[in-house]
Each structure stands twice: as structure tokens, then as C-alpha cells.
Amino acid sequence: MKHSFYQEDELLNNELSNRGFLLTKVDDVIGWARANSLWPMTFGLACCAVEMMQAAASRYDMDRFGMLFRPSPRQSDLMIVAGTLTNKMAPALRKVYDQMAEPKWVLSMGSCANGGGYYHFSYSVVRGCDRIVPVDVYVPGCPPTAEALIYGLMQLQKKIKRTTGFKYDARQTH
């Protein structure tokens, strides 16, 4: 009886799983590890940072997602930009982003970080942090709720799990 490659893989997987082994691809394991051990660095600029603190507190407990807030960009792989980004603060944001190790992700939180928000037409406001750093996930709201932030983080985890191998992100950097 001849089997196709997929049937052989399925038979091997069933046989090994009955013995307590796991058969998977290395890319899947790497994606799972990266997605479930994010180390965010906060870049709280305004009132959205208060909602971010609420999401990290005991009611929502971001630690259950494997997140550990880090004070240094060199130890972080996720930057959460929360609040109004001014023209004076933009070079500092870019410098902190450049100090992060690859692979790195950015989550833009709130209307001000996404597109300038209420202060969109002010001369001193950057109309979206995506003009300075590449953004992976946008969380809308003014300010967004803690639930919205956690939903955005879950979407980022799904995105990270879809990436394969040791290739770094091919996003355009400015």
C-alpha cells in the first residue's frame, strides 16, 4: 500500500504523539516562543500611558501573556508608543527604536500616536508615529481601553507567529 508524503507525516506524527513526542517545524517553535515572550518597552507620552498601566495591573495582567516590561531598549523587542508625539520628541523615539535588537515590533496606541489625534493640526505634533518608525499594530481610541490594548497585543502575537525562521523583518526603515 502506497502512501503520499502527507499521509506518512501524519502516520509518523500520530505514532510519535502516542509516545509523548511532538513533531513540528522549527519555524513554528520559534514563532511560538517569540510571540509568547514579548518584552515591551513603554514610550508613554500622554494619557494613553495610564491605560497601558491599567492593562499591566492585576485586573488584566499582561504577565499572563509572557510579557515583562523592560526599562532599556536593548532588552526589549516591542515598543508601545502611547500618546502625542511632538517634533522635539521624534528624534528620541527613533534613537530608542534603533537601539532595540532585531527582531523588533512597534504598537501604536491611541489616536494621537496613530495620526496626531486631537492635536493633529498643531505645528508641533507629528501626525502619526509611523512617519518616524514602522508600526506593526495600531490600537484606536482616545484613550483606548485596556481591553483594546490587550486585543492589539493578541493581534501582534498572531502576526509574530506567522513569521518564519530567523529572517528579520523586511519593513522599510526611514
Curated annotation (Swiss-Prot):
Q: Which SUPFAM superfamilies match?
A: HydA/Nqo6-like
In this chain, [4Fe-4S] cluster is annotated as bound at C47, C48, C112, C142
Enzyme superclass (EC): translocase
Predominant subcellular localization, coarse grouping: membrane
Enzyme Commission code: 7.1.1.-
Report the subcellular localization: Cell inner membrane
Name the chemical reaction catalysed here.
a quinone + NADH + 5 H(+)(in) = a quinol + NAD(+) + 4 H(+)(out)
Q: Cofactor note, please?
A: Binds 1 [4Fe-4S] cluster.
Q: Enumerate the UniProt keywords alphabetically.
A: 4Fe-4S, Cell inner membrane, Cell membrane, Iron, Iron-sulfur, Membrane, Metal-binding, NAD, Quinone, Translocase, Transport, Ubiquinone
How is this protein annotated for GO cellular component? plasma membrane; respiratory chain complex I
Its BP terms in the Gene Ontology are: aerobic respiration; electron transport coupled proton transport
One Pfam family of this chain: Oxidored_q6
Q: Name one GO molecular function term.
A: NADH:ubiquinone reductase (non-electrogenic) activity
Task: Provide the membrane topology annotation.
Answer: Peripheral membrane protein
**Which cofactors must be present for this protein to function?**
[4Fe-4S] cluster
The record, for InterPro entries, names: NADH_UbQ_OxRdtase-like_20kDa, NADH_UQ_OxRdtase_20Kd_su
Q: Which family, according to UniProt? A: Belongs to the complex I 20 kDa subunit family.
**What does the subunit section of this Swiss-Prot or TrEMBL entry state?**
NDH-1 is composed of 14 different subunits. Subunits NuoB, C, D, E, F, and G constitute the peripheral sector of the complex.
Stored NCBIfam families: nuoB_fam (TIGR01957), PRK06411.1 (NF005012)
Provide the function of this protein.
Answer: NDH-1 shuttles electrons from NADH, via FMN and iron-sulfur (Fe-S) centers, to quinones in the respiratory chain. Couples the redox reaction to proton translocation (for every two electrons transferred, four hydrogen ions are translocated across the cytoplasmic membrane), and thus conserves the redox energy in a proton gradient.
Question: What's this protein's name?
Answer: NADH-quinone oxidoreductase subunit B
According to the entry, what is the taxonomic lineage of the organism? Bacteria, Pseudomonadati, Pseudomonadota, Alphaproteobacteria, Rickettsiales
